[in-house]
Amino acid sequence: DAGSSEGVYWEPSRGQIDAEKLEGFDAIVHLAGENIAGKRWSTKQKRRIRDSRVSSTELLVKTVSGLANPPNVLVSASAIGFYGDRGDETLDDEASPSDETFLSRTAQEWEQATDLLQDSNVRLVKTRFGIVLSPQGGALKELLRPFNFCLGGKVGNGRQYWSWVTIDDVVQSLMFCLQNNAISGPVNVVSPNACTNLEFVKALGSVLRRPTILPLPGFVARTVLGEMAEELLLHSTRVVPNKLLEHGYQFRDPVLTDALSILLGRSGKNHD
């Protein structure tokens, strides 16, 4: 039952889920998905990235829609890749997507997989995550690698916008969305202060006290990482978290240099 400490068995690739154990839950948060930066994007890997998101969401939503006692709210992950490569255009929660990139198409399908619940009594929240910064790994770990060898610098021309958010704000914003019945639909989970790639690497270099004078040319990134470099490093997505702010969410880490200092243990502060 919903009060049990046991896990709920499911295997999305086979369309299997223990539906009975989902009865009576107050809320479900769905964050499953293959790491988009885990491997170079072969055709097979892109299929895994897409299917791990879309197929699992379709299975969960179909199951929830058939429950006798469904949850009050379902929070389903998405990503700001939904918007595509948009230059310096400011993108709020209601901005239209681009269908020109793999990540945008994937995110659109990912969100469309929740459509079955649109007219139900389940409150549906689609959290579009930005670049998540965590001391445990992920994007920040990869971004630190060149700095460890004093090779840090901008990627491409450095003018592309990176919309970032700390792991603490991810967790807190998820809790905020779960507890606030007025929030539904797409929610941008990003810091209110997006920055350019050049600004990001300069902030990181400042915190690490390392130089940022060795750029990574775009053509080199594309040669090494292919399409993945284009979409993850060189595309520009300037996103604002209007819905969170309008509903009163207060970011714990709104300023990049302060956030990096805390994450990298350089500030003497930490979050409880």
Residues covered by each model-derived region:
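NAD(P)H-binding glycine-rich loop region in Rossmannoid oxidoreductase-like domains
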Residues: 2-59
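Alpha-helical substrate-binding/gating segment
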Residues: 144-152, 160-195
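Conserved Rossmann-fold NAD(P)-dependent oxidoreductase catalytic core, especially the SDR/UDP-sugar
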Residues: 58-101
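Mid/C-terminal beta-alpha module of Rossmann-like enzyme folds, strongest
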Residues: 180-227, 261-272
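Catalytic helix-loop patch of NAD(P)-dependent Rossmann-fold dehydrogenases
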Residues: 51, 55, 87-126
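NAD(P)-dependent short-chain dehydrogenase/reductase
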Residues: 115-126, 130-162, 204
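Glycine/proline-rich active-site loop of Rossmann-fold NAD(P)-dependent oxidoreductases
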Residues: 108, 120, 133-142, 177-187
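C-terminal amphipathic/interface module of NAD(P)-dependent oxidoreductases
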Residues: 231-272
